[in-house]
Amino acid sequence: RSNPSGNSDWQNASGTINIGDDLTITVSGNSADGLNINGATVLNIGKNATINTLYNGELKYSNGDTSDGAHAVRANFHATINIGEGLTAGTLGESSHAVYAAQGRSTTNPTGGSKINIGKGAVLSTAGDGSHTVMMASNNGKIVIEEGAEMTTLGDGSHGVAAYADTSAKGSVANGAVEIGAGSTIATAGGGSHGVFANMTGSVLSLDDNVGITTEGDASHGLLAPVS
């Protein structure tokens, strides 16, 4: 986490963090994110990172716990996260997203949203209810998932890609963008779990060539943009 502990002014945090290849982060505990980057901080991570992974192919952490509200990759305010190719990121608890652009508007930089760039061949998964693999909730934010990604959700109300409208004391959240690279796949298994969902004003969700979307649960649409 890029802000000092107990410092409520984290939207002003700044600096650059550089991490090489083969990073491994494992967290267990409610509201315990793998990465939580704030303010104007830039985080650069190399290839083949592993964050919040599944152990031995089973849907549990090493101690058997799940963690609610614990995201794998999270950027707040106008922070930037860049991760190289081969990322594996998984979450197990409820309301726990794999890639999350969050925290709406900054009072110091209200037009600057958070940015997340994920390299080729990412494997993103969530197991809990209300847990999306890619979640956009940042004013003017942007998420780019490069080609060949695999995105899988198992829980109910868990979308592959979501752009949600939001409001806060700092103002409304709008105009977020998500780009999904060519040859990527999106699969959802739970009820009410859409492949791609958008209700954010001004949001732009772009799917490149040969993106495949599969949904299995009841009331789970491939693409849904509801009327507000």
Name each model feature, range by range:
Residues 1-193, 197-220, 224-228:
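Surface-exposed loop/turn motifs in large extracellular/passenger domains
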